[in-house]
UniProtKB/Swiss-Prot annotation:
Organism: Picrophilus torridus (strain ATCC 700027 / DSM 9790 / JCM 10055 / NBRC 100828 / KAW 2/3)
Protein name: TATA-box-binding protein
PROSITE patterns tied to this protein: TFIID (PS00351)
GO biological process: one example: DNA-templated transcription initiation
Protein family (similarity comment): Belongs to the TBP family.
Length: 184
């Protein structure tokens, strides 16, 4: 089993642009169940059940998609929004570029970790560990540029990845680093 098969993607945040300008009041009427309260938040929130995602739509035409577990769901979500807006006679781009901003994933090293020893071994320039503040160790990986949160249980949360393969690279790197110093 490859490392990627053991990694669970929890959330993908992606962005796109659907137009130069959008009338959010008109969209709020067109998208049943949407939330638009401009005095509290400048964007319109719309939640989909399938795929289970949410989009934030802004007057500037920018759209953020969150909650997707894979890239297909991101694309499907954006396509659904485009379709619904076009049906409401709201002009939007046909096939906008979608940019992944962040992928959050979880991995289990299947071994308890001594975070104090790890903090000493991995070098203070890339590690933050203050157990009184937060129970995990923050490990900033240079290449790929991601942040790993390591917990005593052996669970690892990866954040900051833009591509799925970066998560796998980071997991392989941290495993090698920990094996090299005999901590797993």
């Amino acid at each position: 089993m490859s490392e990627m098969e053991k990694i669970t993607i929890e959330n993908i945040v992606a962005s796109t642009s659907l137009a130069e300008h959008l009338d959010l009041s008109k969209i709020a009427l067109a998208l049943e169940g949407s939330e638009y309260e401009p005095e509290q938040f400048p964007g319109l929130i719309y939640r989909l059940q399938e795929p289970k995602t949410a989009v934030l739509i802004f007057r500037s035409g920018k759209v953020n998609c969150t909650g997707a577990k894979n890239l297909d769901d991101v694309k499907k979500t954006i396509d659904i929004i485009i379709d619904k807006l076009k049906k409401a006679d709201i002009e939007v781009y046909d096939n906008p570029d979608i940019i992944v901003q962040n992928i959050v994933a979880v991995y289990d090293l299947e071994s308890n970790l001594n975070l104090t020893d790890i903090a000493m071994s991995l070098g203070l320039e890339n590690v933050e560990y203050e157990p009184e503040q937060f129970p995990g160790l923050v490990y900033r990986v240079e290449e790929p540029k991601v942040v790993l949160l390591l917990f005593g249980s052996g669970k690892v949360v990866c954040t900051g990845a833009k591509e799925e393969n970066e998560i796998e690279q980071a997991v392989i790197k941290v495993k090698k680093d920990l094996q090299k110093v005999g901590l797993i």
